[in-house]
Amino acid sequence: SQDDGLRLRAAQFLLENMADKGYLTGRSIEEYYNFIDSVYQIKQEEYDIPYIYATFRQQAKYLKENPVLNWDVQTLSADYLIQNIDEAFAVWNRPWNRHLTFEEFCEWILPYRVGTEIPEVWRALYRERFEPLLMNDSIRTAQQACKVINDELIKLPIHIATQSAMGLCLRPSTLINIKFGLCGDYANLALDDMRDCGIHVGI
């Protein structure tokens, strides 16, 4: 069918663009993610961000261990890519993106991650939280959909850090609970969110 043909081309697009994509793993990386995930569970008005990062550096056991570079093309499974393709196609029928060409869809909605964060299955997590906001027949354009999502994101705690304890792209499951972070962290959160809702965006 035509749909199967497009999905095959989508898979080819991802594979052709994977050659130089990678991510870091290791005990130091996992330790940092666990620390940030735990801190993001704390709700308060203000955060002493330099103190929080200094605490991590003091407590970290594996900070000096070199992480391992993993290449997407060698580590991501076919099932992972297929699930991402299926979930991306599921939102390519919204009023605000039906006009997109296949090439535009591949460029703006299909990608499975933003930067060098650890790849994970993230779209369902974001869809559950944000898609209900767009279930309104009056939302017809990408600009309208984008405003709805932005209005919701602005309600999140926004505390901008000038540096982080480790220069990592945070994974989507961490970002969705953000309490503070780099400007890029908030931008990546918005991109993940809008991409999952079928709003064509990029950085």
Give residue ranges: language-model regions.
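N-terminal accessory/pre-domain segments preceding catalytic cores
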Residues: 1-147, 151, 155, 175, ...
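A short secondary-structure junction motif
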Residues: 156-160
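Hydrophobic/aromatic-rich core segments of domains that either
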Residues: 140, 145-152, 163-173, 179-203
